[in-house]
Amino acid sequence: MKLSDIKNGNLSAEWAEKGYELPKFDVEAVKAKTHAEPTWVHFGAGNIFRAFPAAILNEALNSGKYDRGVIVAESFDYEIIDKAYQPYDNLSLLVCLKSTGDIEKKVIASVTESLKADYSFGEDWARLVEIFQNPSLQMISFTITEKGYGVAPADLERGLTPVLAMGKVTALLYERFKAGKLPLTVQSMDNCSHNGDKVKSAVHAYASKWVEQGLVPAEFLAYVQDETKITFPWSMIDKITPRPDAKVQDMLAKDGFEDNYTIVTEKHTFTAPFVNAEETQYLCIEDHYTNGRPPLELGGVLYCDRETVDKIEKMKVCTCLNPLHTAMSIYGCMLGYTLISAEMADEDLRPFIQKIGYIEAMPVVVDPGVLNPYEFIGAVINRRLPNPFMPDAPQRIATDTSQKLAIRFGETIKAYEERGLDKSNLVLIPLVLAGYARYLKGIDDNGQPFEISTDPLLAELQAIVAPLKVEAGEQDFSCLKALYSRTDVFGVDLYAVGLGEKIESMAKELFAGPGAVRATLHKYVKAR
């Protein structure tokens, strides 16, 4: 069993017998139609694209109600195209890993072309220019990570041949401008708040610079700023897509699926002819398009207005997912866990995050109306976090914790203040914040050192807790005032809102020698 069997029409009964779902549409007909009249180009050929946007389109094509595929362009790691797309005729296998242990296997055939988005690849770049000049093009989208929207001064000086993704996209938009000021929607699908604004500011920066340098007419800047022509909608995306997993690889090999190996590029991208991902997924997009759009609602995309996208993002980041992640990362590291799914079997940690979410954060949740916060958090706690197939680690989530606490917990505390709610009801959120001081010591609950995850403020914050020792007995905890009064870290001065002393008291318990983290966690979770 190989992906090439699909193109060759050499499909044995094994595919169906072993539970592989095959395309229900005419792959070659869709490819021909897309080549002639492309509607969607996606930048970023990584695992999340194949597991989510491409899979959504695959569902739309399977419905028989749509007839165009997606063209993928890679602007950073060109080996992905050479090694994970073109040898397999742009087909891939999506392995959906469910928390029940069930596995879904689907061949994704919605990607009709794969291109290297750089001038040095002459034919590919010429094809991208041709696509951008075609009136049929409706949307370009991105999964290039938040860093991909960066603008470097040196790149702005390169003129019309920039090397960064946003510069290349702006150059292609200039081709569309020259073809008749054709409309287009520029859609970020990356996991960052107000993502459309990040693309917008980058494109505007390049266009402004080029006008200033006399490389393009002022009308081009007006074109990318005209929302009847070019729009930059916001979106909220949520799906975990880890690198190819060895257990999945073994399972596919046992099935007789031969395209089961991992590919590691020179730029250290981990990819494969298959992609493994969790079952739960959300993609909510601001419905602001200037030239029509693919009907991705057929694959489960939720279209709404900008305010609703923002509310969904806040629901996720401030209440229903991210705060639980951070609580598990801080305490998971101190308790010696290396897998989030394993933490969910812990008799203290599971109720810890349940009570943080349902009892303490949910009273001030931002309800977007189109997604039920209780259903969302229920999926997180009961399906997503316990999923044994998701090799997510508390150590990964603990990265940059100082940059996350304000939005993940500070916003809830502010909401209690603004609504006049009784902050004495906050017990486990303060325990998370007390745990952060203990975490900064880099000593686990057995008294052994552990490696603290990278963080831009790590040295600075560790210096604050340096006088404290992880040991029983009296010590002066007054140094913690310098930590818990920092609004840049917590979003509020925790003393000013009446929580500083409570958190200090909890920290004293957590520092009381080996076993104190477990004992303190158990005490407060049980009491709550």
Question: What are the residue ranges of the model-derived segments?
Answer:
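Substrate/ligand-engaging "lid" and interaction regions
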Residues: 1-43, 47-528
